[in-house]
């Protein structure tokens, strides 16, 4: 099907039509986005420069932090810039590209979180075989699988939408291009595509969440036979990961597991998985991990790690 598009650009409603309020919101997003880039960037650089943070856990954490920067960068800079110039507009091609990129990095993050859960399972439940299983080749393969999974998810979410005609209206009640608000602008029957989106996005969010929770229940069951010191260290690492998982997957499930209808609350819910999770990632992982904190202090202090 060849799409006939009378719409060449899309206008975002955003959070508010009051420009004073919008400017305050844009300043808040600017501060949060700056913190996302600096915090996650510091984790990436610290791990790359460190001679101590060499375990697979930190290898995966560096990739997760890099993906968080990319994920947040898909929509935050444009939202901030548009708010200051008072023109919340994006081209149709730009909108579709933003939607594809958002789901690519979001899907990659979801798969990386599952990879990190598997890494913790092997480290805690099979410590004697950990380095043999999680060798350099396996770590590289798991990262490539995460990127590939994110790409397949994004293609599955957006390919059919790229074929739809858009003939008006062109006003989107959101602050970035996502599948639900984009489908509402299409001049065609989107029922079948909506089902595919629920199956793809919703199932990945829900299934991934329950698989991750199940893996941590297995770890908790295994830890009952460990001493208190070992339990505390393992639980501290797992608690950090579970917190990130909850902040990311619960809001995603609320948005993508239901029919493709945009609700006013979607904009607030979306803030959690597009900004809040990337913002809290460095706080959760660094503040609860003595090795990361010490490595950061040495790196910032200009010492050899």
UniProtKB/Swiss-Prot annotation:
Cellular component, GO annotation: plasma membrane
Main location: membrane
Membrane topology label: Multi-pass membrane protein
Glycosylation positions in this chain: 6, 18
Matching SUPFAM superfamilies: Family A G protein-coupled receptor-like
Pfam families with a match to the protein in the record: 7tm_4
Annotated transmembrane regions: 24-47, 56-77, 99-118, 138-156, 194-217, 234-256, 268-287
PROSITE patterns named among the record's database cross-references: G_PROTEIN_RECEP_F1_1, G_PROTEIN_RECEP_F1_2
Localization per Swiss-Prot or TrEMBL: Cell membrane
Family matches, as Gene3D superfamilies: Rhodopsin 7-helix transmembrane proteins
Topology Cytoplasmic: residue spans: 48-55, 119-137, 218-233, 288-305
GO molecular function: G protein-coupled receptor activity; olfactory receptor activity
Cysteine pairings via disulfide bonds: 95-187
Extracellular side: 1-23, 78-98, 157-193, 257-267
Keywords for the protein's UniProt record, in alphabetical order: Cell membrane, Disulfide bond, G-protein coupled receptor, Glycoprotein, Membrane, Olfaction, Receptor, Sensory transduction, Transducer, Transmembrane, Transmembrane helix
Keyword Membrane: yes
Family, similarity comment: Belongs to the G-protein coupled receptor 1 family.
Function: Odorant receptor.
Name of the protein described by the UniProt record: Olfactory receptor 4X1
Gene (UniProt): OR4X1
């Amino acid at each position: 099907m060849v799409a006939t598009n009378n719409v060449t650009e899309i206008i975002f409603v955003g959070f508010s039509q009051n420009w004073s309020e919008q400017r305050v919101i844009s300043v808040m997003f600017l501060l949060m986005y700056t913190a996302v880039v600096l915090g996650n960037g510091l984790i990436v650089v610290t791990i790359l420069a460190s001679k101590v943070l060499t375990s697979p856990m930190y290898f995966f954490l560096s990739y997760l932090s890099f993906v968080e920067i990319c994920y947040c960068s898909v929509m935050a800079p444009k939202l901030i810039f548009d708010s200051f110039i008072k023109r919340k507009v994006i081209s149709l091609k730009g909108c579709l590209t933003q939607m594809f990129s958002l789901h690519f990095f979001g899907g990659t993050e979801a798969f990386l979180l599952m990879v990190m859960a598997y890494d913790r399972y092997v480290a805690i439940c099979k410590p004697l075989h950990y380095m043999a299983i999680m060798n350099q080749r396996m770590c590289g393969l798991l990262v490539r699988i995460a990127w590939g999974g994110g790409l397949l998810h994004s293609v599955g979410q957006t390919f059919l939408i790229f074929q739809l005609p858009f003939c008006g209206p062109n006003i989107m009640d959101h602050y970035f291009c996502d599948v639900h608000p984009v489908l509402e602008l299409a001049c065609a029957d989107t029922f079948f595509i909506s089902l595919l989106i629920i199956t793809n996005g919703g199932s990945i969010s829900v299934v991934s969440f329950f698989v991750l929770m199940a893996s941590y229940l297995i770890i908790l069951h295994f830890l009952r036979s460990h001493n208190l010191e070992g339990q505390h260290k393992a639980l501290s690492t797992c608690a950090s990961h579970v917190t990130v998982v909850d902040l990311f997957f619960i809001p995603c499930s609320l948005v993508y597991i239901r029919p493709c209808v945009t609700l006013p609350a979607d904009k607030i819910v979306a803030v959690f998985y597009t900004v809040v999770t990337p913002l809290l990632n460095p706080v959760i992982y660094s503040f609860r991990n003595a090795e990361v904190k010490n490595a950061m202090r040495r790196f910032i202090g200009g010492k050899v790690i």
